[in-house]
Amino acid sequence: MSEFKGIPVSSGSVVERDGVRTIKDGVKRRDDGQGAVRRRKPQWLKARAPGGEGYRSVRGIVHDHHLSTVCEESHCPNLGECWSHGTATFMVLGSVCTRTCRFCSVDTGNPKGRLDPQEPEHCAESVRLMGLRYVVLTSVDRDDLPDGGAEHYAQCVRAIKADNPDTAVEALTPDFRGDEEAVRTVVDSGLEVFAHNVEVVRRLSPQVRDPRAGYEQSLAVLQVAKRLRPGVLTKSSLMVGLGETDAEIDEAFDDLLRAEVDIVTLGQYLQPTRNHLPVERFVSPDEFEALRQEGLRRGFREVVAGPLVRSSYRADRVLEGNNVGLPSVGPDVG
C-alpha cells in the first residue's frame, strides 16, 4: 500500500471499461472504508454547475463521436463553464491510463494496445461542428504501446489540421517514457503549442506521480520539444496545495525556464475522491496573483494562475495579448 505523508492511498474497486479491467478513478478504494480527510472548500473554489444549451450541445457532439474528454475523466471543476461556452478538451488514445498518479481520477489499467482507428476523424469532425479555432488535445499514458501512442496522437493533430486549416492545436502530451523520437513525432505533426506537465515541485514528484514518471524526465521532454521545433510554443503546469514551499515553486520556475518553457499555468490541487491525496492547504486568489507576477518577473512569456486554473483552461486566451507570438483566435477550448 502506497502512502503520502503517512496516509494510505490504495486498495479496492475494479471495473470493466471498453473490454478492459480498470481501477476506477485511478486509485483503489481502501478496504477499511476510510480515506484521506477531505477539507471543506473555501468560497472561491465554488464552480458553476453543468447546464444550458451550450453544455448540452457539446455533450451531444462528444458522445455522438465516442470521444473522451479530460473534462469528464478528470472531474474538472471547470466542466460546467467550458461546456456551457461550447468548448471541451479532447482526450485521445482512449480513456484508460497505464499509470497510477496519486492525484488523478482517470481510470487505470492495461488497454493491451487497443486504439480507435476512427478517433482522428472523429476529433476533426467534432472540431468542425463546434467551430473551434483553437483546440487542446490531451491523452492518457499508453505504456502498452511501443511509441507510447505518439503516432496515433500525431494522426489526430494532422486530421484536425486537414479539416480545419485555420484551427490552432495545442497538444498536452504524456512523457512517452522520455523517448525523443516519440516527442519528435508529435511536435512535427503541425501543432502550435506543445505542452507537458511537470505537475508538482521536484521534492513531491516521487510521492505524487507514478514511479515511471519523473520531474527530470518531464523537463527533458519539454527541452527536447523546444530543441526540435524552436518555433513551437512550449507550456507546462504546476499544482499547488500539496505541501510545497514558495522557494520550491521558485525553483520549479527556474527549472522550467532553463528548459525554455514559454508558458506556465498554476492551479489548486483538488482531491478527486477520499482515496486520493489530501489537500494540504487552499491557496488564496491573492497568492495565485503573486505567483503569476513572480513567474512573469522571472521571464515566462505568460503565466496563468488561479484556484480553478487547469492546464487547458481557456487556453487560447493566453494568446489574446499577442505576447507569445501567435495571433488572437476565436472560441476557446476548456
Curated annotation (Swiss-Prot):
UniProt cofactor note: Binds 2 [4Fe-4S] clusters per subunit. One cluster is coordinated with 3 cysteines and an exchangeable S-adenosyl-L-methionine.
Keywords: 4Fe-4S, Cytoplasm, Iron, Iron-sulfur, Metal-binding, S-adenosyl-L-methionine, Transferase
Coiled-coil annotated residue ranges, if any: none
Cofactor(s) demanded: [4Fe-4S] cluster
Chain positions recorded as [4Fe-4S] cluster 2 binding sites: C97, C101, C104
Domain called Radical SAM core: residue spans: 83-301
Pathway: Protein modification; protein lipoylation via endogenous pathway; protein N(6)-(lipoyl)lysine from octanoyl-[acyl-carrier-protein]: step 2/2
Binding site for [4Fe-4S] cluster 1: C71, C76, C82, S312
Gene Ontology CC, one term: cytoplasm
Xref: Pfam families: LIAS_N (PF16881), Radical_SAM (PF04055)
EC category: transferase
Molecular functions per Gene Ontology: 4 iron, 4 sulfur cluster binding; lipoate synthase activity; metal ion binding
Reaction(s) catalysed (UniProt annotation): [[Fe-S] cluster scaffold protein carrying a second [4Fe-4S](2+) cluster] + N(6)-octanoyl-L-lysyl-[protein] + 2 oxidized [2Fe-2S]-[ferredoxin] + 2 S-adenosyl-L-methionine + 4 H(+) = [[Fe-S] cluster scaffold protein] + N(6)-[(R)-dihydrolipoyl]-L-lysyl-[protein] + 4 Fe(3+) + 2 hydrogen sulfide + 2 5'-deoxyadenosine + 2 L-methionine + 2 reduced [2Fe-2S]-[ferredoxin]
EC number: 2.8.1.8
Record localization: Cytoplasm
Superkingdom of the organism of origin: Bacteria
SMART domains xref list: Elp3 (SM00729)
Major site of localization recorded for this protein: cytoplasm
PANTHER family named among the record's database cross-references: LIPOYL SYNTHASE, LIPOYL SYNTHASE, MITOCHONDRIAL
Family: Belongs to the radical SAM superfamily. Lipoyl synthase family.
Alphabetical list of HAMAP family matching this protein: Lipoyl_synth
Protein name, UniProt field: Lipoyl synthase
UniProt lineage: Bacteria, Pseudomonadati, Pseudomonadota, Gammaproteobacteria, Chromatiales
